[in-house]
């Protein structure tokens, strides 16, 4: 791992752990680098495990990115749950609005410059890989009227276990992705899917009975 001990922000790590975890925070389960901006810490963070260094925020991701110049942003006024051994790379932006809930399952990773914007409810399963430059967003932020009907501004997103999200993919409100699916790079994913082990693109299911190795 390119980033080492010298890149850890001791003050941010102490502040984060004691703010959210109280006495459990003395084990420093979350390690934060200097390039992470703790924009808003008014919300609630819960962990599956409080082992030292269990969660890493702001460390290296893919080798083709200049991680030294990437700024991660942590902006949580709602609720965030992180499973064991979740890795959040440099440049990742996480925003959880008031009364919203974001859950990321164990052994999942979010790569460089991806963004998760949660204003309702987003559930990400275990062993999920989110590649670089992705956007997962459960809200339109502006209400849309279709004829005489006002559409919902936000809808929950569900992503199952062992899903691989290719680079530069957008996952929008109301999406449901079953276990062990692949989201094609560059796709705009909408709608609900029920079939496991599929390759899904903007146009829908492209292949069936696919699998991938982490």
Language model regions located:
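Short amphipathic alpha-helical patches
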Residues: 131-134, 151, 186-187
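Flexible glycine-rich beta->alpha loop in the catalytic core of nucleotide-sugar glycosyltransferases
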Residues: 142, 187-188, 194
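Short secondary-structure boundary/capping segments
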Residues: 149, 190-191
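Glycine-rich NAD(P)-binding loop of Rossmann-like domains
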Residues: 149-159
């Amino acid at each position: 791992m390119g980033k080492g001990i010298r890149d850890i922000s001791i003050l941010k790590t102490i502040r984060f752990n004691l703010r959210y975890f109280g006495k459990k925070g003395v084990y420093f389960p979350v390690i934060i680098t200097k390039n992470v901006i703790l924009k808003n810490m008014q919300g609630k963070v819960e962990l599956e495990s409080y082992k030292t260094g269990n969660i890493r925020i702001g460390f290296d991701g893919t080798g083709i990115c200049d991680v030294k110049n990437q700024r991660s942003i942590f902006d949580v006024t709602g609720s965030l749950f992180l499973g064991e051994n979740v890795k959040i790379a440099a440049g990742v932006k996480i925003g959880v609005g008031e009364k919203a809930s974001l859950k990321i399952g164990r052994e999942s990773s979010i790569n460089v410059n991806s963004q998760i914007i949660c204003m309702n409810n987003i559930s990400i399963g275990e062993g999920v890989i989110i590649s670089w430059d992705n956007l997962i967003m459960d809200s339109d932020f502006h209400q849309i009227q279709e004829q005489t009907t006002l559409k919902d501004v936000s809808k929950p997103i569900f992503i199952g276990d062992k899903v691989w999200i290719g680079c530069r993919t957008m996952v929008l409100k109301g999406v449901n992705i079953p276990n062990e699916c692949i989201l094609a790079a560059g796709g705009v994913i909408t709608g609900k899917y029920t079939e496991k082990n599929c390759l899904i693109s903007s146009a829908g299911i492209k292949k069936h009975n696919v699998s991938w190795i982490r």
